[in-house]
């Protein structure tokens, strides 16, 4: 890369300041880089960070290092209470991105007249990091959601009837969430888009208050409007690539599968999870012939991503589904049609542990 001798500075304090901020910027980049490498397993996010760190390292000339004097730094060891509030990876990434951006701005200002190459490099890296931070945070959001998905054992799918109002739906979902359900898929086949939007908004807020995932069935527009955690698509819905382009990289995409070829296709395309079914006959999919427990056994052997057995599963039939290899199930009527959705949820969760 381009480099040049650094002209002597009449003020050694500037060299010391630049040294401190080069250390700050490179250390912050390394923190973010290591999370992208080990936490997100995203080489595409690691490469630019490593390159920027190397660029700054090559411009960290001896004259700056020789001006270092931590023993006389009046602010050495000075902390701030906000540092103790970084309790998760996202907070750490944000804090270190800000740290790098601030350090680069300081370098840019003070190096402009004495080290033009360093000043230009600092400015270029700073602007590039603004956009790169967004990509990293999107990846963090997807990683967090995928972990929640891995942990989920029971998915509640709503299927309110044409006469069911929003209040009753919300009450039943809330009872399930309070009982431990951690994944809700909103599906309404009857009703206006206005009603769907109203229900989806309330359910999304409710799920996020309970730290549960909220997925919208079919409707990418609704999912985006209510900031859902993702969408679930049937075999006749939008192709995965187009859905991902609309949703962005941070959201989850699930796909219904009814045979092995569809499961393989969903995995190859990048789906985050799949539904496997219908296992038994079900009123919600009356036109589809049950695939049976043999399909569950096939999925158990072939799936490399989280999958949920679905279709006619109740507390009575769940043990057979578990014996076939399913660790996760999705239900509709077993909870939504129950007189006591809270107890029904607890019973199903107990059978899944």
Swiss-Prot record:
GO terms of molecular function: magnesium ion binding; thiamine-phosphate diphosphorylase activity
Pathway noted in the entry: Cofactor biosynthesis; thiamine diphosphate biosynthesis; thiamine phosphate from 4-amino-2-methyl-5-diphosphomethylpyrimidine and 4-methyl-5-(2-phosphoethyl)-thiazole: step 1/1
Ligand binding (2-[(2R,5Z)-2-carboxy-4-methylthiazol-5(2H)-ylidene]ethyl phosphate): 282-284, 312, 332-333
Signal peptide: none
Binding site for Mg(2+): 218, 237
Cofactor: record remark: Binds 1 Mg(2+) ion per subunit.
Name this polypeptide is given: Thiamine-phosphate synthase
Protein's organism: Synechococcus sp. (strain WH7803)
């Amino acid at each position: 890369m381009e480099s040049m001798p650094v002209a002597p500075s009449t003020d050694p304090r500037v060299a010391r300041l630049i040294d401190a901020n080069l250390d700050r910027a490179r250390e912050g980049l390394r923190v973010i880089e290591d999370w992208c490498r080990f936490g997100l397993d995203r080489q595409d996010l690691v490469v630019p960070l490593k390159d920027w760190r190397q660029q700054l390292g090559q411009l960290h000339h001896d004259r700056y290092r020789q001006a270092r004097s931590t023993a006389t730094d009046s602010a050495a060891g000075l902390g701030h209470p906000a540092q103790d509030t970084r309790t998760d990876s996202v907070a750490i990434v944000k804090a270190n991105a800000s740290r790098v951006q601030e350090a680069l701005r300081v370098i840019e200002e003070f190096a402009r007249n004495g080290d033009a190459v360093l000043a230009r490099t600092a400015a270029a890296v700073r602007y590039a990091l603004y956009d790169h931070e967004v990509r990293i945070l999107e990846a963090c959001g997807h990683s967090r959601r995928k972990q929640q998905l891995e942990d989920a054992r029971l998915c509640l799918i709503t299927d309110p009837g044409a006469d069911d109002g929003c209040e009753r739906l919300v009450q039943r979902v809330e009872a399930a969430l309070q009982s431990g359900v951690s994944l809700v898929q909103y599906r309404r086949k009857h009703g206006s888009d206005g009603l769907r939007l109203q229900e989806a908004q309330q359910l999304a807020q409710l799920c996020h208050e309970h730290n549960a995932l909220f997925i919208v069935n079919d409707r990418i527009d609704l999912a985006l409007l209510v900031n859902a955690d993702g969408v679930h698509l049937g075999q006749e819905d939008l192709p995965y690539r187009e859905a991902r382009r609309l949703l962005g990289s941070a959201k989850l995409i699930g796909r219904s599968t009814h045979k092995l070829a569809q499961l393989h296709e969903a995995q190859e395309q990048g789906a985050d999870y799949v539904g496997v079914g219908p296992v038994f006959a079900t009123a919600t999919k009356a036109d589809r012939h049950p695939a049976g427990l043999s399909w569950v056994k096939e999925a158990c052997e072939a799936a490399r991503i989280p999958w949920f057995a679905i279709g006619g599963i109740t507390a009575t039939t769940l043990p057979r589904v578990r014996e076939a290899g399913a660790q996760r199930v999705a239900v509709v009527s077993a909870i939504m049609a129950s007189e006591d959705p809270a107890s029904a949820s607890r019973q199903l969760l107990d059978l899944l542990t």
